[in-house]
Curated annotation (Swiss-Prot):
GO terms for cellular component: cytosolic large ribosomal subunit. InterPro entries: Ribosomal_bL35 (IPR001706), Ribosomal_bL35-like (IPR021137), Ribosomal_bL35_CS (IPR018265), Ribosomal_bL35_sf (IPR037229). GO terms for biological process: translation. HAMAP family: Ribosomal_bL35 (MF_00514). This is Large ribosomal subunit protein bL35. It comes from Buchnera aphidicola subsp. Acyrthosiphon pisum (strain APS). Keywords: Ribonucleoprotein, Ribosomal protein. The lineage of its organism: Bacteria, Pseudomonadati, Pseudomonadota, Gammaproteobacteria, Enterobacterales. The gene is rpmI.
Length: 65
């Protein structure tokens, strides 16, 4: 049986934690930042965990993670 290929775009976007969950960067911090408040930008800065509804999909993208 052939090996399952890793989805490379997902491999660049998600990192696995020690407990097996995935963390990701939040959206809305790439451009048009002048109209966003400093507080809004600061709250978007930290990485957050992938929601439980999306975990199975992300795991299928990264079979060897």
């Amino acid at each position: 049986m052939p090996k399952i290929k890793t989805l490379k775009s997902a491999a660049k976007r998600f990192k696995i934690t020690a407990s097996g969950k995935f963390k990701r960067k939040q959206a809305n911090l790439r451009h048009i930042l002048t109209k966003k408040t400093t507080t809004k930008k600061r709250h978007l800065r930290p990485k957050i965990l992938v929601s439980t509804g999306d975990m199975d999909r992300v795991k299928s993208f990264l079979p060897y993670a």
